[in-house]
Amino acid sequence: MAGSKCLALIAHDQKKDDMAAFARANQELLSRWKIVATGTTGGRVLDAAPDLDVTRLKSGPLGGDQQIGALISTGEVDALIFFVDPLTPMPHDVDVKALMRLAIVYDIPMALNHATAIKLLPTLEA
């Protein structure tokens, strides 16, 4: 991933449609980025915007959140867009909290909902 800016995309199950719509509507801006995503989210993003450069990692509950956290800690992820569903309990909630903690510790831009992502994306330099 060296040499190009990397954006991580993650969405909880109830927010995957929103992430797919976000990717489709923002293909031009997203095309400037190398994208890493958890498995299912990455698949949905590719279905919606097949020309994007998306690397799919494991599904969130199977370690994908932790994989993205590791990439944040090594400086390989430059920004995070994570569409969180606050109304549905997540069995891997501790992984989600750890991921958000790493984004804060390493001071990378992070959007947790569509409204923030829409404002953040154009301000990021790819």
From Swiss-Prot:
Keyword DNA damage: no
This enzyme's EC code(s): 4.2.3.3
GO cellular component, one term: cytosol
Catalytic class of the enzyme: lyase
NCBIfam families: MGSA, PRK05234.1
Pfam families: MGS
Family membership: Belongs to the methylglyoxal synthase family.
Active site residues per record: D65
Entry's Gene Ontology BP terms: methylglyoxal biosynthetic process
GO MF, any single term: methylglyoxal synthase activity
Xref: InterPro entries: Methylgl_synth, Methylglyoxal_synth_AS, MGS-like_dom, MGS-like_dom_sf
Species the sequence originates in: Rhizobium etli (strain ATCC 51251 / DSM 11541 / JCM 21823 / NBRC 15573 / CFN 42)
Annotated catalysed reactions: dihydroxyacetone phosphate = methylglyoxal + phosphate
Residues binding substrate: H12, K16, T38, G39, T40, T41, S59, G60, H92
Gene that encodes the chain: mgsA
The keyword Lyase appears for this protein: yes
Protein name: Methylglyoxal synthase
Segments forming domain MGS-like: 1-126
HAMAP family associated with the record: Methylglyoxal_synth
Function: Catalyzes the formation of methylglyoxal from dihydroxyacetone phosphate.
